[in-house]
């Protein structure tokens, strides 16, 4: 199947199921079964109920989809990067 044949849709995750599967409500009101793409699993991108996602669907089976992107939504900030409780660098001695 060529990539040009895929249908791209947006939706909201309504239910989290076992084995990286999700129920997603499309913008047009239909509900489909979706799974997260391999790159999302590889980079450990977590998908929660209420997340807005982009999906790819094949025209042959419109009840299944692959989640390709999770939209960033406002929420608590992520972990602070940069060293944590590291002391400041030492200054060289003056002679």
UniProtKB/Swiss-Prot annotation:
Region (Disordered): 70-95
Keyword tRNA processing: no
Gene Ontology molecular function: any one: translation initiation factor activity
Alphabetic keyword roster: Cytoplasm, Initiation factor, Protein biosynthesis, RNA-binding, rRNA-binding
PROSITE patterns on file: S1_IF1_TYPE
Limits of the S1-like domain: 1-72
Compositionally biased region (Pro residues): 86-95
Subcellular location: Cytoplasm
One GO CC term on file: cytosol
Pfam families per the UniProt record, alphabetical: eIF-1a
InterPro entries in UniProt: NA-bd_OB-fold, RNA-binding_domain_S1_IF1, TIF_IF1
Family per record: Belongs to the IF-1 family.
Subunit description: Component of the 30S ribosomal translation pre-initiation complex which assembles on the 30S ribosome in the order IF-2 and IF-3, IF-1 and N-formylmethionyl-tRNA(fMet); mRNA recruitment can occur at any time during PIC assembly.
Free-text function comment from the UniProt entry: One of the essential components for the initiation of protein synthesis. Stabilizes the binding of IF-2 and IF-3 on the 30S subunit to which N-formylmethionyl-tRNA(fMet) subsequently binds. Helps modulate mRNA selection, yielding the 30S pre-initiation complex (PIC). Upon addition of the 50S ribosomal subunit IF-1, IF-2 and IF-3 are released leaving the mature 70S translation initiation complex.
NCBIfam families on file: infA
Protein's UniProt name: Translation initiation factor IF-1
Native species: Rhodospirillum rubrum (strain ATCC 11170 / ATH 1.1.1 / DSM 467 / LMG 4362 / NCIMB 8255 / S1)
């Amino acid at each position: 199947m060529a990539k040009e044949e895929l249908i791209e849709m947006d939706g909201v995750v309504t239910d989290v199921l076992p084995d990286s599967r999700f129920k997603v409500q499309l913008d047009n009101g239909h509900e489909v079964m979706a799974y997260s793409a391999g790159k999302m699993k590889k980079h450990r991108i977590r998908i929660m109920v209420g997340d807005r996602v982009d999906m790819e669907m094949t025209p042959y089976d419109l009840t299944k989809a692959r989640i390709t992107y999770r939209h960033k939504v406002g929420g608590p900030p992520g972990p602070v990067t940069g060293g944590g409780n590291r002391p400041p660098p030492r200054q060289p001695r003056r002679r």
